[in-house]
Structures are given as structure tokens and as C-alpha cells.
A protein has these predicted regions:
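Conserved PLP-enzyme active-site core in the AAT-like
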Residues: 1-160
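Conserved small/polar residues in nucleotide/adenosyl-binding loops
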Residues: 161-166
Length: 167
């Protein structure tokens, strides 16, 4: 994942004479496809000192809120906008996603204005109900399902680390 030091270096590099107003937002992907998670809490706290919004593509982290075994969601860590692709890590149809907004730095009315311009006037109720069903499943059975999942990951990890090298 991206470290706070890397963010500080980038902000310094792209700010003219340390005028942080040159930077309109920082966009991160966390977790990455490979599962690397950035220190969102520290990064958000640093950026918020300069009124810089943090947008996190948390496509592969929609499950974070549903088990203590997973990292904290970027929403809870203070990111201003977080996008989850629900279908990637939860039982939902492909193309389903959710955008979360933490009020404070971002102009919510501006987002609504653009959202209304670009959203479909014919939303897919099948996709929306898939999100609702998915969230219902993890709300009602998430503890059990994710405990089983974590147990299987632990077993797999042990097997991979104790297997003899193929060479």
C-alpha cells in the first residue's frame, strides 16, 4: 500500500511553494487487487490539515466493515469519498457498487449535481436489489460466513508456508 511518507512527498512535489491549494484531491486504491492496504487513517489526517479530500477506490474492500479480521474500511478511517465494488467481495451481481461520502471537506451538493447529470434515468432494479440482498446476507449471517472464510484463509496460508519448495 501507499505510505504516509509517499503521500507527503507527492504533496510536496506537486504543490507550488507549499501552497496546498494546488492539489484538489488525492485518489488512492486500497486495497489493491493483490490485497495491499494503505494507511488511510494517517493519510486522511495529513491531507485534512490542508483541506485536501481523500478519495479511495476500495473496490476490493467492500467486506471490510463486516469482520474484525479485516482491515478497517476507508470510510471509518476518514476518507472523504469511498467507492466499493460490492460484487468483488460480497455476494452481489457484477456491476454493483456503492459510493460513500463522509461529510466535511467534499461539496456534497456538487456531487449530487453531477450525479444527477450522469446517472441513468432507468436504473437497474435488479442490480439495486442485488446490493440490498447482499447487504442483508452479510448483516444477518456475516459473522458466521466471514469466520469460515478467515479459517479457510488461515489453513491455506499455513499450507502454502509449510509446503516444500517446488525446486
Amino acid at each position: 500500500g501507499i505510505t504516509l511518507k509517499e503521500i507527503k512527498d507527492i504533496v510536496d512535489k506537486y504543490s507550488s511553494d507549499h501552497d496546498r491549494n494546488d492539489i484538489k484531491a488525492v485518489i488512492l486504491t486500497s486495497p489493491t487487487y493483490e490485497g495491499n492496504v494503505s494507511d488511510i487513517k494517517s493519510i486522511a489526517e495529513y491531507l485534512h490539515q490542508y483541506n485536501i479530500p481523500l478519495i479511495v477506490d476500495e473496490a476490493h474492500g467492500a467486506h471490510f466493515n463486516f469482520s474484525e479480521s479485516f482491515p478497517q474500511s476507508a470510510v471509518k478511517c476518514g476518507a472523504d469519498i469511498v467507492i466499493n465494488s460490492v460484487h468483488k467481495t460480497l455476494p452481489s451481481l457484477t456491476q454493483t457498487a456503492i459510493m460513500h461520502i463522509n461529510y466535511g471537506i467534499v461539496d456534497v451538493e456538487r456531487i449530487r449535481r453531477y450525479w444527477n447529470i450522469y446517472q441513468s434515468t432507468s436504473p437497474s432494479y435488479i442490480l439495486m436489489s442485488s446490493i440490498a440482498r447482499s447487504l442483508s446476507i452479510v448483516k444477518n449471517d456475516g459473522d458466521k460466513l466471514f469466520a469460515e472464510y478467515v479459517d479457510k484463509l488461515t489453513i491455506l496460508s499455513c499450507l502454502l508456508y509449510t509446503s516444500p519448495s517446488p525446486r
